[in-house]
Curated annotation (Swiss-Prot):
Heme c binds at residues 10, 67, 116, 119-120. Cytochrome c' is the most widely occurring bacterial c-type cytochrome. Cytochromes c' are high-spin proteins and the heme has no sixth ligand. Their exact function is not known. The keyword Heme applies. Keywords: Electron transport, Heme, Iron, Metal-binding, Transport. Binds 1 heme c group covalently per subunit. This is Cytochrome c'. Pfam families: Cytochrom_C_2. Homodimer. GO terms for cellular component: periplasmic space. It comes from Pararhodospirillum photometricum (Rhodospirillum photometricum).
């Protein structure tokens, strides 16, 4: 695959993850009565986070204007660990949603958002 294909893939994957977060936020805030659907959104985020490190192979830094910092590649193990943390947090949210525990869903969504923020602070422009 071309480096450009990897860049496009990760842009789309991260956009999808963000869109799932927006949907989850609306559900958790009670704007939509779709608690049963929340687990699906959380599971999608977990899947994206699990696959994300593979979308940043060597040779794809600086290919196009992106928000990824060079530290993604120089601290690849830390980047992978952050992706795992996000995946685990998304799985915890899915479990809370499956159990119908709205209070725990709110806590789990906040925890997931915290993992996203932590990764963004280190690895995103």
């Amino acid at each position: 695959a071309s480096p450009e294909a990897y860049v496009e893939y990760r842009k789309q994957a991260l956009k999808a993850s963000g869109d799932h977060m927006k949907a989850l936020s609306a559900i958790v805030k009670g704007q939509l009565p779709l608690n049963a659907e929340a687990a699906k959104h959380a599971e999608a985020i977990a899947a994206i986070m699990e696959s994300l490190p593979a979308a940043f192979p060597e040779g794809t830094a600086g290919i196009a204007k992106t928000e990824a910092k060079a530290v993604v590649w120089s601290k690849a193990d830390e980047f992978k660990a952050d992706a795992v943390k996000s995946a685990d947090a998304a799985k915890a949210l899915a479990q809370a949603a499956t159990a119908g525990d709205t209070a725990q869903m709110g806590k789990a969504l906040a925890a997931l958002g915290g993992t996203c923020k932590g990764c963004h602070e280190t690895f995103r422009e």
